[in-house]
UniProtKB/Swiss-Prot annotation:
Keywords: Cell membrane, Copper, Disulfide bond, Glycoprotein, GPI-anchor, Lipoprotein, Membrane, Methylation, Secreted, Signal. It comes from Waitea arvalis. Residues 1-20 form the signal peptide. The keyword Lipoprotein applies. This is Lytic polysaccharide monooxygenase-like protein X325.
Amino acid sequence: MHSFTSFALVAASLASVAQAHFQLQWPGARGAFVANDEVYFCGAHNNVTTNRTDFPLDGSGFVSIKSGHAPYTVGAIISLETDADAWEDFKNSSGGDQIAIAYRQVDNSGTYCVPFNPSSLNIAGIQDGANATIQVVYTGGDGNLYQCADVTFRTTVANLNSSVCTNSTGGDDHSHSSSVTGSTTASAPSTSQTANAAIPFDRWCCYHPWLCWYLRVSPVKTLKGLLLSLPYPCNAFQ
C-alpha cells in the first residue's frame, strides 16, 4: 500500500506537468500538433511547410493560441529566412532573438490572442510577398514549448476576420468571454539551450518540494531513480 501511494503521488505530479501545453490556433501551425514534441524547435517540425498562411501587413493580423495551463508566459520570435530550420535563423544581427511579439504573462487558461502588425517591427525584408516564420515561445513554469507558423506577407488579406481575435478563460473556452490581458513586462525565456535536457534532482525539488521531501524520506528509493531518468524540459530557468 505504501508503494502504491508513492506511485500515485508521482503519477499525479507528472500528470499536472503534462497539462502545461498550448496549441497554435492562427496562423496555421507547421505540422501536426503533438504535445510531447512541443519541447523541441518548432514542435519537432524542422521542415518549412509549402502551404504557407497569407499574413496581412495592414495591421489586421494576429496570433492566437489555446493554453491548457495558467499562468504562463508567451511571446514570439520571427525569421525571414525562406527555410527557417534552426535557432540561428531567428537571431538578429547582434545574436539575440528577433522578437516579433513581446513576452507577457497571462493568468488564465483558454484562448489568448495578440494583435500583430509585422510592419511595425522595422525589420528589413518585411514586405509584400516575403516569406517568414513566426515561432511562438511558451512556458508554463516548467520549461519552454514551441510551435511555428510559416507565413507569406501580403499587403492585405481578403476574408480575414480579425473579430475572431478574442480571449477566453477556463478549460472550456467556448462560452466564457473575458477581457484577459497580458503584461508585457515578463522576461524572455532562453531559446538557446537543449529543450529536452534532463533536470537535476535538486532543481526538480524547487518545483515540487512536497514530493521531493517525500522521496527523500521514503524507503521507495527507486522512485528517485525513475525521476532522474526522465527528460524534463527546464531550459527556461537554466
